[in-house]
């Protein structure tokens, strides 16, 4: 998840019915630099997912459904009006 402060950037949200699998601790909300570039790292290996935001680990979760997943990687923006998202320097590496 990438969202404004207070909305769990770095957490894992599944939009196909399960909702939040894991949200970030409140004390990590200030790691997000609003209005500036942020660096997000996502590592998925088997059923383990780890996320980092600006070098700080945000979550680490094991989930069988994620581990069974196959397919494509997509970048998604939800409706909400007035949101502008930019991506740069995307890198994907096979583990």
Each language-model region and where it sits:
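Carbohydrate-interacting regions of secretory-pathway proteins
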Residues: 1-95
């Amino acid at each position: 998840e990438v969202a404004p402060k207070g909305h769990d950037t770095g957490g894992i949200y599944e939009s196909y019915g399960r909702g939040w699998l894991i949200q970030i601790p409140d004390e990590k909300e200030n790691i997000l630099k609003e209005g500036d570039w942020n660096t997000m790292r996502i590592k998925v290996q088997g059923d383990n997912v780890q996320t980092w935001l600006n070098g700080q680990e945000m979550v680490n979760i094991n989930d069988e459904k994620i581990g069974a997943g196959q397919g494509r990687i997509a970048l998604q923006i939800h409706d909400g009006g007035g949101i502008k998202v930019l991506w740069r320097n995307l890198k994907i590496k096979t583990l």
